[in-house]
A protein has these predicted regions:
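Acidic, histidine-bearing metal-coordination/catalytic regions of metal-dependent phosphoesterases
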Residues: 1-118, 136-152, 164-202, 254
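Active-site-proximal beta-strand elements of phosphoester/diester hydrolases
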Residues: 77-90, 208-222, 258-261
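His/acidic metal-ligating clusters that form di-metal
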Residues: 7-9, 19-21, 26-42, 47-48, ...
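Flexible, acidic/histidine-containing loops and adjacent segments that form or flank the divalent-metal
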Residues: 38, 153-248
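Active-site neighborhood of phospho(di)ester-bond hydrolases with catalytic His/Asp-centered motifs
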Residues: 82-84, 117-124, 128, 150-156, ...
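Catalytic cores of eukaryotic secretory-pathway lumenal/extracellular enzymes that build
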Residues: 125-128, 142, 204, 214, ...
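Phosphate/oxyanion-binding active-site loops and adjacent basic polyanion-contact surfaces
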Residues: 88-101, 129-135, 232-239, 279
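Active-site environment of divalent metal-dependent phosphoester hydrolases
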Residues: 89-90, 127-130, 157-164, 219-222, ...
Length: 282
């Protein structure tokens, strides 16, 4: 690991090598999905890690620095990437993921007024159970050439666990919700440091834009962000209350986005928890 000043942020490697074409799999998916613990808890939500700050708000300037943010403001516009389900589900998956990551990295032209300001990952970064040993192959290595901050909200695959010894979202929190930027073991010899989001759900404040990112828990389907009147006591209502508060605070601002995983559905209406939260602020 190269020497570097403490608390300094690093994004891309200056001379990234060739893309991976495959990675080793320690356990088969069947071994996870057939575990008694996973089957027993298949229809249960898991506790949501508490945010480190209240309210959980992160300013882009805190990550990028004053100079870069001023460049964005002076340009009068902001460009960014947003993509979900980037994890490589199979050992040959890095090929497909690398094509997408490389295409985004190629959009950096050294022009502050048009270069992407950040990448926002919309969940399911790591398949199949968010294990820390796959963060190198499914996150750090594919995005080693991306020359900007990367923020993320977790998806169900990032949080689901297969045994009572696995802590939900532990690896995600370590790599994206660190108290200060450090070089995580999962990054290997790559330069990117951990992100310092205040929590797994938070608001990213950027010039011309605010993104309210939510964590929809581990169930398949539209997700859960509240207790639903006591049906999911492990979840509680903190996240829904946060969403309501942020929608009210940001009501007068242009460019406010609420993001969660899954990001869209082809059929059916929004579920009551989200519909109610979005309607209360008016």
């Amino acid at each position: 690991m190269p020497d570097r000043p403490a608390d300094k942020r690093y994004f891309a490697d200056p001379a990234p090598g060739a893309d991976e074409t495959r990675f080793s799999v320690d356990n088969s998916s069947a071994q996870y999905y057939d575990s008694p613990y996973y089957k027993l808890h298949l229809s249960q939500v898991l506790e949501v890690p508490k945010p480190r700050t209240h309210p959980p708000i992160l300013k882009l300037e805190h990550v990028w620095g004053h100079e870069r943010v001023q460049q964005i403001i002076q340009s009068g516009q902001i460009a960014f990437h947003a993509v979900g389900d980037t994890g490589a589900a199979r050992h040959t998956g890095p090929i497909t993921e690398a094509h997408v990551a490389d295409a985004m990295a190629a959009e950096f032209k050294g022009k502050p007024d048009s270069d992407p300001a950040f990448l926002y990952l919309l969940g399911d970064l790591i398949y199949n159970f968010g294990e820390d040993q796959y963060y190198y192959d499914q996150f750090y290595e594919p995005f080693r050439a991306y020359r900007a901050p990367i923020f993320a909200i977790p998806g169900n695959h990032d949080g689901v666990v297969y045994s009572d010894k696995a802590q939900s979202l532990a690896a995600f929190v370590k790599n994206f919700c660190a108290e200060k930027p450090v070089h995580p073991v999962e990054a290997g010899n790559l330069l990117r440091t951990s992100m310092t989001q205040p929590g797994v759900y938070f608001t990213l404040e950027a010039p011309f834009l605010s993104i309210v990112g939510l964590y929809s828990n581990v169930l398949e389907g539209p997700g859960v962000i509240s207790s639903k009147n006591g049906r999911f006591p492990k979840v509680g209502d903190d996240q829904k209350t946060f969403l309501e508060s942020e929608l009210k605070r940001l009501k007068a601002k242009r460019g406010s986005i609420a993001a969660m995983h899954p990001t869209a559905r082809r059929r059916g209406a929004a579920r009551p928890a989200r519909r109610g939260a979005c309607s209360r602020p008016g």
